[in-house]
Amino acid sequence: MKTLTSVLLLVSFFFVSSLFAQTGPDRQLQYSKPADKHGLNMFETTKEETSEFVGLKVILGGSSTLQFQGLNHSNSALFVDDGNGANINELIELENNFNLATANLDLDVQLHNGLRMHLRTYLSSRHHPEPYVKSGYLQVDRLDFVSPGFLDNVMDMVTLKVGHMEINYGDAHFRRSDNSASLHNPFVGNYIMDSFTTEVGAEAYLKTNGFLGMLGFSNGKLNQDVTSPGETSLAFLGKLGFDKQVNPGLRLRLTGSIYTNGNAKQIYLYSGDRAGSRYYSVIKGITATRDNFSSGRWNPNFSGKLTAIMINPFLKWNGLEFFGTYENSSGGDSINSNDTRTWNQLAGEVIYRFGASEQWYGGARFNSASGKLANADAEKVTINRVQLAFGWFLTDKVVAKIEYVSQSYNDFAAGSIYSDANFKGIMAEAAIGF
Protein backbone atom coordinates (compact mmCIF):
# COMPACT_ATOMS: atom_id res chain seq x y z
CA MET A 1 0.00 0.00 0.00
CA LYS A 2 2.87 2.33 -0.76
CA THR A 3 1.32 3.89 -3.81
CA LEU A 4 -1.84 5.82 -4.42
CA THR A 5 -2.84 3.34 -7.12
CA SER A 6 -2.79 0.40 -4.75
CA VAL A 7 -4.78 2.33 -2.15
CA LEU A 8 -7.42 3.33 -4.71
CA LEU A 9 -7.73 -0.29 -5.81
CA LEU A 10 -8.10 -1.33 -2.19
CA VAL A 11 -10.76 1.31 -1.56
CA SER A 12 -12.68 0.25 -4.66
CA PHE A 13 -12.54 -3.41 -3.70
CA PHE A 14 -13.78 -2.91 -0.17
CA PHE A 15 -16.38 -0.36 -1.23
CA VAL A 16 -17.92 -2.96 -3.50
CA SER A 17 -17.59 -5.56 -0.75
CA SER A 18 -19.26 -3.26 1.75
CA LEU A 19 -22.29 -2.90 -0.48
CA PHE A 20 -22.92 -6.59 0.08
CA ALA A 21 -21.66 -6.79 3.66
CA GLN A 22 -23.60 -3.80 5.05
CA THR A 23 -27.30 -3.23 5.04
CA GLY A 24 -29.28 -0.41 6.58
CA PRO A 25 -27.94 2.44 8.67
CA ASP A 26 -26.12 0.22 11.20
CA ARG A 27 -22.38 0.81 10.80
CA GLN A 28 -21.47 -0.30 14.31
CA LEU A 29 -19.46 -3.47 14.80
CA GLN A 30 -19.46 -5.58 17.95
CA TYR A 31 -17.35 -4.31 20.85
CA SER A 32 -16.06 -1.30 18.96
CA LYS A 33 -15.66 2.45 19.42
CA PRO A 34 -17.59 4.78 17.09
CA ALA A 35 -15.38 7.07 15.03
CA ASP A 36 -17.83 9.99 15.23
CA LYS A 37 -19.22 12.08 18.11
CA HIS A 38 -20.77 8.97 19.68
CA GLY A 39 -17.24 7.85 20.58
CA LEU A 40 -16.49 10.93 22.72
CA ASN A 41 -15.07 10.08 26.15
CA MET A 42 -14.89 6.39 25.27
CA PHE A 43 -11.59 4.80 26.18
CA GLU A 44 -11.21 1.03 25.88
CA THR A 45 -14.08 -0.83 24.23
CA THR A 46 -16.61 -2.30 26.66
CA LYS A 47 -18.10 -5.77 26.96
CA GLU A 48 -21.54 -4.47 26.07
CA GLU A 49 -22.85 -6.00 22.85
CA THR A 50 -23.44 -2.90 20.74
CA SER A 51 -24.73 -4.90 17.78
CA GLU A 52 -25.77 -8.43 16.93
CA PHE A 53 -23.59 -10.66 14.80
CA VAL A 54 -25.38 -11.39 11.52
CA GLY A 55 -22.43 -12.49 9.42
CA LEU A 56 -19.47 -10.87 7.75
CA LYS A 57 -19.71 -7.09 7.87
CA VAL A 58 -17.23 -4.70 6.24
CA ILE A 59 -17.20 -1.06 7.34
CA LEU A 60 -15.27 1.42 5.24
CA GLY A 61 -14.59 4.58 7.22
CA GLY A 62 -12.21 7.47 7.28
CA SER A 63 -11.47 11.04 8.24
CA SER A 64 -10.18 14.27 6.78
CA THR A 65 -8.85 17.32 8.60
CA LEU A 66 -7.57 20.75 7.59
CA GLN A 67 -6.05 23.52 9.72
CA PHE A 68 -5.42 27.20 9.25
CA GLN A 69 -2.30 28.23 11.15
CA GLY A 70 -1.76 31.75 12.43
CA LEU A 71 1.28 31.36 14.71
CA ASN A 72 4.36 33.47 15.35
CA HIS A 73 7.52 32.50 17.22
CA SER A 74 10.59 34.09 18.78
CA ASN A 75 13.74 33.27 20.76
CA SER A 76 16.82 34.98 22.19
CA ALA A 77 19.44 32.35 21.33
CA LEU A 78 23.04 33.33 20.68
CA PHE A 79 24.44 33.50 17.16
CA VAL A 80 25.83 30.10 16.15
CA ASP A 81 27.62 29.95 12.80
CA ASP A 82 26.78 27.01 10.57
CA GLY A 83 30.20 27.28 8.95
CA ASN A 84 28.96 29.40 6.07
CA GLY A 85 28.16 32.56 7.99
CA ALA A 86 24.50 31.72 8.64
CA ASN A 87 23.00 31.62 12.13
CA ILE A 88 21.55 28.16 12.81
CA ASN A 89 19.59 29.63 15.74
CA GLU A 90 17.75 32.12 13.53
CA LEU A 91 14.09 31.07 13.33
CA ILE A 92 12.44 30.38 10.02
CA GLU A 93 9.88 33.00 8.98
CA LEU A 94 6.24 31.91 9.34
CA GLU A 95 3.15 33.12 7.51
CA ASN A 96 -0.56 32.74 8.21
CA ASN A 97 -1.78 30.01 5.90
CA PHE A 98 -3.20 26.50 5.60
CA ASN A 99 -1.40 23.33 6.61
CA LEU A 100 -1.41 20.12 4.60
CA ALA A 101 -4.84 18.47 4.54
CA THR A 102 -4.56 15.07 6.21
CA ALA A 103 -6.68 11.98 5.58
CA ASN A 104 -7.12 8.46 6.99
CA LEU A 105 -8.74 5.35 5.56
CA ASP A 106 -10.20 2.89 8.08
CA LEU A 107 -11.18 -0.68 7.35
CA ASP A 108 -13.14 -2.53 10.05
CA VAL A 109 -14.37 -6.06 9.50
CA GLN A 110 -16.61 -8.25 11.65
CA LEU A 111 -15.12 -11.67 10.88
CA HIS A 112 -17.08 -13.81 13.32
CA ASN A 113 -19.14 -13.43 16.47
CA GLY A 114 -16.88 -11.45 18.82
CA LEU A 115 -13.99 -11.40 16.35
CA ARG A 116 -13.13 -8.25 14.41
CA MET A 117 -10.25 -6.63 12.57
CA HIS A 118 -9.19 -2.98 12.37
CA LEU A 119 -6.78 -1.47 9.83
CA ARG A 120 -5.87 2.22 9.50
CA THR A 121 -4.00 3.72 6.56
CA TYR A 122 -2.68 7.28 6.49
CA LEU A 123 -3.56 8.54 3.02
CA SER A 124 -1.97 11.94 3.61
CA SER A 125 0.17 12.95 6.58
CA ARG A 126 2.70 15.64 7.42
CA HIS A 127 5.65 13.25 7.62
CA HIS A 128 4.83 11.03 4.63
CA PRO A 129 3.47 12.29 1.29
CA GLU A 130 2.66 8.72 0.26
CA PRO A 131 -0.05 6.51 1.79
CA TYR A 132 1.14 3.92 4.29
CA VAL A 133 -0.40 1.60 6.87
CA LYS A 134 -0.37 3.03 10.39
CA SER A 135 -1.50 -0.07 12.29
CA GLY A 136 -3.82 -3.03 12.40
CA TYR A 137 -5.03 -5.54 14.96
CA LEU A 138 -7.35 -8.45 15.64
CA GLN A 139 -9.69 -8.09 18.64
CA VAL A 140 -11.23 -11.15 20.29
CA ASP A 141 -14.27 -10.78 22.56
CA ARG A 142 -15.86 -14.20 21.96
CA LEU A 143 -14.42 -17.65 21.23
CA ASP A 144 -17.32 -18.91 19.14
CA PHE A 145 -14.87 -19.64 16.31
CA VAL A 146 -13.61 -22.52 18.51
CA SER A 147 -17.15 -23.72 19.24
CA PRO A 148 -20.42 -21.88 19.94
CA GLY A 149 -20.47 -20.55 23.50
CA PHE A 150 -16.92 -21.69 24.24
CA LEU A 151 -15.77 -20.14 27.56
CA ASP A 152 -18.56 -17.56 27.42
CA ASN A 153 -18.40 -17.01 31.19
CA VAL A 154 -14.75 -16.03 30.85
CA MET A 155 -15.18 -14.00 27.69
CA ASP A 156 -17.96 -11.97 29.34
CA MET A 157 -15.05 -10.25 31.11
CA VAL A 158 -12.03 -10.76 28.83
CA THR A 159 -10.82 -9.06 25.65
CA LEU A 160 -7.70 -10.00 23.66
CA LYS A 161 -5.89 -7.83 21.10
CA VAL A 162 -2.96 -8.76 18.90
CA GLY A 163 -1.31 -6.95 16.01
CA HIS A 164 1.07 -4.21 14.90
CA MET A 165 -0.92 -1.63 16.79
CA GLU A 166 -1.17 1.48 18.93
CA ILE A 167 -0.21 0.31 22.41
CA ASN A 168 -2.58 1.10 25.28
CA TYR A 169 -0.27 3.13 27.51
CA GLY A 170 -2.19 5.76 29.50
CA ASP A 171 -5.55 7.32 28.66
CA ALA A 172 -4.32 10.46 26.88
CA HIS A 173 -3.86 8.62 23.57
CA PHE A 174 -7.64 8.05 23.39
CA ARG A 175 -8.19 11.85 23.31
CA ARG A 176 -5.38 12.78 20.91
CA SER A 177 -5.58 13.52 17.20
CA ASP A 178 -4.36 10.54 15.16
CA ASN A 179 -3.38 12.24 11.92
CA SER A 180 -6.81 13.27 10.53
CA ALA A 181 -8.84 11.39 13.17
CA SER A 182 -9.39 14.39 15.43
CA LEU A 183 -13.10 14.44 16.38
CA HIS A 184 -12.37 13.13 19.88
CA ASN A 185 -9.70 15.76 20.63
CA PRO A 186 -11.31 18.96 21.99
CA PHE A 187 -8.15 20.88 21.03
CA VAL A 188 -6.06 21.17 17.88
CA GLY A 189 -2.69 20.07 19.30
CA ASN A 190 -1.70 16.99 21.30
CA TYR A 191 0.51 16.93 24.40
CA ILE A 192 4.05 18.35 24.56
CA MET A 193 5.36 14.84 25.27
CA ASP A 194 3.08 12.86 22.97
CA SER A 195 3.04 9.33 24.43
CA PHE A 196 2.11 7.32 21.37
CA THR A 197 3.69 4.53 19.35
CA THR A 198 2.79 1.49 17.27
CA GLU A 199 4.57 -1.79 18.00
CA VAL A 200 3.95 -5.49 17.38
CA GLY A 201 2.42 -6.99 20.49
CA ALA A 202 -0.55 -8.38 22.37
CA GLU A 203 -2.79 -7.16 25.20
CA ALA A 204 -5.19 -9.04 27.50
CA TYR A 205 -7.99 -7.17 29.29
CA LEU A 206 -10.20 -7.97 32.26
CA LYS A 207 -13.32 -5.79 32.46
CA THR A 208 -15.95 -6.33 35.15
CA ASN A 209 -18.18 -4.11 37.31
CA GLY A 210 -16.28 -0.97 36.36
CA PHE A 211 -12.88 -2.52 37.05
CA LEU A 212 -10.28 -2.56 34.28
CA GLY A 213 -7.04 -4.52 34.21
CA MET A 214 -4.66 -5.00 31.29
CA LEU A 215 -1.36 -6.78 30.75
CA GLY A 216 0.53 -6.67 27.49
CA PHE A 217 3.85 -6.86 25.75
CA SER A 218 5.42 -5.64 22.53
CA ASN A 219 8.66 -6.12 20.64
CA GLY A 220 9.66 -2.51 21.41
CA LYS A 221 10.13 -1.56 17.75
CA LEU A 222 8.33 1.01 15.63
CA ASN A 223 10.07 -0.10 12.44
CA GLN A 224 10.20 -3.86 12.10
CA ASP A 225 13.34 -5.74 11.08
CA VAL A 226 15.08 -9.06 11.69
CA THR A 227 18.71 -7.97 11.26
CA SER A 228 19.49 -6.44 14.67
CA PRO A 229 19.66 -9.40 17.07
CA GLY A 230 19.83 -8.56 20.76
CA GLU A 231 19.58 -4.80 20.33
CA THR A 232 15.98 -4.52 21.60
CA SER A 233 14.18 -6.68 24.16
CA LEU A 234 10.49 -7.12 24.82
CA ALA A 235 8.63 -4.16 26.31
CA PHE A 236 5.91 -4.77 28.89
CA LEU A 237 2.88 -2.64 29.70
CA GLY A 238 0.00 -2.72 32.11
CA LYS A 239 -3.01 -0.73 33.23
CA LEU A 240 -5.29 -0.76 36.27
CA GLY A 241 -8.36 1.39 36.62
CA PHE A 242 -11.93 2.00 37.60
CA ASP A 243 -14.62 3.52 35.39
CA LYS A 244 -18.13 3.98 36.78
CA GLN A 245 -21.28 5.79 35.71
CA VAL A 246 -22.30 6.71 39.25
CA ASN A 247 -25.64 8.21 38.21
CA PRO A 248 -27.08 9.63 34.97
CA GLY A 249 -25.17 12.89 35.45
CA LEU A 250 -21.90 11.73 36.99
CA ARG A 251 -19.12 9.51 35.64
CA LEU A 252 -15.80 8.85 37.39
CA ARG A 253 -12.69 7.16 35.99
CA LEU A 254 -9.18 6.73 37.33
CA THR A 255 -6.40 4.68 35.71
CA GLY A 256 -2.71 4.05 36.18
CA SER A 257 -0.46 2.72 33.41
CA ILE A 258 3.12 1.54 33.02
CA TYR A 259 5.40 0.90 30.04
CA THR A 260 8.87 -0.52 30.58
CA ASN A 261 11.73 -1.75 28.42
CA GLY A 262 15.10 -2.61 29.93
CA ASN A 263 17.04 -2.95 26.69
CA ALA A 264 16.24 -0.94 23.58
CA LYS A 265 18.48 0.53 20.91
CA GLN A 266 15.93 3.31 20.44
CA ILE A 267 12.93 4.39 22.52
CA TYR A 268 9.88 5.23 20.41
CA LEU A 269 7.28 6.12 23.05
CA TYR A 270 7.71 9.87 22.48
CA SER A 271 8.63 9.78 18.80
CA GLY A 272 6.26 7.14 17.45
CA ASP A 273 3.75 9.54 15.90
CA ARG A 274 4.86 9.51 12.28
CA ALA A 275 1.88 11.67 11.27
CA GLY A 276 3.43 14.78 12.82
CA SER A 277 2.64 17.68 15.13
CA ARG A 278 -0.15 20.17 14.38
CA TYR A 279 2.11 23.20 14.90
CA TYR A 280 4.06 23.43 11.67
CA SER A 281 7.68 24.71 11.67
CA VAL A 282 7.54 26.45 15.07
CA ILE A 283 10.91 27.05 16.80
CA LYS A 284 12.76 25.70 13.80
CA GLY A 285 15.83 27.31 12.27
CA ILE A 286 16.25 28.68 8.78
CA THR A 287 18.12 25.51 7.81
CA ALA A 288 15.29 23.20 8.93
CA THR A 289 13.84 20.89 6.30
CA ARG A 290 10.21 21.26 5.32
CA ASP A 291 9.48 17.61 6.16
CA ASN A 292 10.42 18.09 9.82
CA PHE A 293 7.39 16.68 11.62
CA SER A 294 8.01 17.12 15.35
CA SER A 295 7.88 20.91 15.77
CA GLY A 296 6.02 22.02 18.88
CA ARG A 297 6.35 18.76 20.78
CA TRP A 298 9.23 17.33 22.81
CA ASN A 299 11.03 13.99 22.71
CA PRO A 300 13.29 13.39 25.76
CA ASN A 301 15.42 11.14 23.51
CA PHE A 302 15.81 8.31 25.99
CA SER A 303 17.89 5.38 24.81
CA GLY A 304 18.82 1.98 26.18
CA LYS A 305 15.98 1.73 28.70
CA LEU A 306 12.75 3.37 29.81
CA THR A 307 10.15 3.05 32.53
CA ALA A 308 7.16 5.37 32.14
CA ILE A 309 4.17 5.71 34.45
CA MET A 310 0.99 7.65 33.68
CA ILE A 311 -1.97 8.40 35.96
CA ASN A 312 -5.21 9.76 34.46
CA PRO A 313 -8.28 10.97 36.37
CA PHE A 314 -11.46 11.71 34.40
CA LEU A 315 -14.70 13.22 35.65
CA LYS A 316 -17.84 14.11 33.74
CA TRP A 317 -20.67 15.85 35.57
CA ASN A 318 -23.45 16.68 33.15
CA GLY A 319 -21.77 18.96 30.58
CA LEU A 320 -18.61 19.57 32.62
CA GLU A 321 -15.53 17.42 32.04
CA PHE A 322 -12.11 17.22 33.67
CA PHE A 323 -9.26 15.11 32.31
CA GLY A 324 -5.85 15.08 33.94
CA THR A 325 -2.44 13.53 33.35
CA TYR A 326 0.57 12.93 35.55
CA GLU A 327 3.47 11.20 33.82
CA ASN A 328 6.89 10.20 35.15
CA SER A 329 9.45 8.83 32.68
CA SER A 330 12.90 7.60 33.62
CA GLY A 331 15.27 6.39 30.93
CA GLY A 332 18.85 6.01 29.83
CA ASP A 333 21.12 8.53 28.14
CA SER A 334 22.41 5.95 25.67
CA ILE A 335 22.43 2.22 25.09
CA ASN A 336 26.00 1.99 26.46
CA SER A 337 25.40 4.13 29.56
CA ASN A 338 24.09 3.23 33.00
CA ASP A 339 23.14 6.86 33.68
CA THR A 340 19.46 7.69 33.89
CA ARG A 341 17.49 10.90 33.80
CA THR A 342 13.86 11.76 34.42
CA TRP A 343 11.14 13.78 32.73
CA ASN A 344 7.78 14.67 34.29
CA GLN A 345 4.66 15.81 32.48
CA LEU A 346 1.53 17.38 33.93
CA ALA A 347 -1.65 18.24 32.06
CA GLY A 348 -5.13 19.28 33.07
CA GLU A 349 -8.06 20.22 30.90
CA VAL A 350 -11.55 21.45 31.68
CA ILE A 351 -14.24 21.16 29.01
CA TYR A 352 -17.82 22.38 29.17
CA ARG A 353 -20.23 20.97 26.58
CA PHE A 354 -23.61 22.59 26.03
CA GLY A 355 -26.54 22.63 23.65
CA ALA A 356 -29.40 20.20 23.16
CA SER A 357 -26.97 17.40 22.21
CA GLU A 358 -23.83 18.97 23.71
CA GLN A 359 -22.85 20.01 20.21
CA TRP A 360 -21.01 23.12 21.47
CA TYR A 361 -18.05 23.18 23.81
CA GLY A 362 -15.40 25.44 25.28
CA GLY A 363 -12.30 24.37 27.11
CA ALA A 364 -8.87 25.13 28.51
CA ARG A 365 -5.76 22.99 28.93
CA PHE A 366 -2.49 23.54 30.77
CA ASN A 367 0.42 21.25 29.88
CA SER A 368 3.93 21.27 31.32
CA ALA A 369 6.94 19.00 30.73
CA SER A 370 10.25 19.26 32.57
CA GLY A 371 13.44 17.24 32.87
CA LYS A 372 17.10 16.94 32.05
CA LEU A 373 18.61 16.97 28.59
CA ALA A 374 20.91 14.29 27.17
CA ASN A 375 23.66 14.94 29.72
CA ALA A 376 22.36 13.58 33.03
CA ASP A 377 24.22 16.34 34.92
CA ALA A 378 22.63 19.16 32.91
CA GLU A 379 20.20 21.62 34.46
CA LYS A 380 16.49 20.87 34.25
CA VAL A 381 14.54 22.62 31.51
CA THR A 382 10.79 23.28 31.39
CA ILE A 383 8.27 23.65 28.58
CA ASN A 384 4.83 25.13 29.34
CA ARG A 385 1.78 25.33 27.11
CA VAL A 386 -1.67 26.92 27.47
CA GLN A 387 -4.50 26.06 25.06
CA LEU A 388 -7.95 27.65 24.88
CA ALA A 389 -10.48 26.09 22.52
CA PHE A 390 -14.03 26.47 21.27
CA GLY A 391 -15.76 23.90 19.08
CA TRP A 392 -19.01 23.12 17.30
CA PHE A 393 -20.21 19.73 16.09
CA LEU A 394 -22.17 20.66 12.98
CA THR A 395 -23.27 17.01 12.84
CA ASP A 396 -22.12 13.89 14.65
CA LYS A 397 -19.47 13.49 11.98
CA VAL A 398 -18.29 17.07 11.39
CA VAL A 399 -16.60 19.43 13.86
CA ALA A 400 -15.11 22.91 13.59
CA LYS A 401 -12.79 24.21 16.31
CA ILE A 402 -10.60 27.19 17.00
CA GLU A 403 -7.71 27.25 19.45
CA TYR A 404 -5.44 29.85 21.00
CA VAL A 405 -2.08 28.34 21.97
CA SER A 406 0.97 29.74 23.75
CA GLN A 407 4.06 27.64 24.44
CA SER A 408 7.24 28.77 26.21
CA TYR A 409 10.66 27.15 26.67
CA ASN A 410 12.44 27.93 29.94
CA ASP A 411 15.99 27.45 31.29
CA PHE A 412 17.56 26.31 28.02
CA ALA A 413 21.20 27.29 27.41
CA ALA A 414 21.87 30.56 25.61
CA GLY A 415 23.37 28.67 22.68
CA SER A 416 20.25 26.55 22.18
CA ILE A 417 17.62 27.50 19.62
CA TYR A 418 15.10 27.01 22.46
CA SER A 419 16.64 29.76 24.63
CA ASP A 420 13.69 31.90 25.84
CA ALA A 421 11.71 30.57 22.89
CA ASN A 422 7.97 31.01 22.52
CA PHE A 423 5.29 30.43 19.94
CA LYS A 424 1.70 31.59 20.14
CA GLY A 425 -1.32 32.39 18.04
CA ILE A 426 -4.50 30.97 16.59
CA MET A 427 -5.23 27.59 15.03
CA ALA A 428 -8.51 26.77 13.27
CA GLU A 429 -9.43 23.22 12.33
CA ALA A 430 -12.26 21.51 10.46
CA ALA A 431 -12.57 17.74 10.71
CA ILE A 432 -14.75 14.99 9.29
CA GLY A 433 -14.86 11.46 10.70
CA PHE A 434 -17.08 8.47 10.00
Predicted regions and their residues:
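N-terminal secretory signal peptides that target proteins for export/translocation
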Residues: 1-3
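Detector for intrinsically disordered, low-structure N-terminal pre-sequences
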Residues: 6, 10, 15, 281-282, ...
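N-terminal periplasmic/intermembrane-space "pro-region" immediately following the signal or transit peptide
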Residues: 6-7, 13, 19-68, 74-77, ...
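Hydrophobic alpha-helical membrane context
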Residues: 14-15, 211, 415
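Outer-membrane beta-barrel pore domains
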Residues: 23-35, 73, 91-92, 137-140, ...
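Outer membrane beta-barrel
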Residues: 51-72, 87, 92-223, 229-263, ...
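Short, polar loop/linker segments at the starts of domains and inter-domain junctions
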Residues: 75-85
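Short glycine/proline-rich turn/loop motifs
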Residues: 84-87, 294
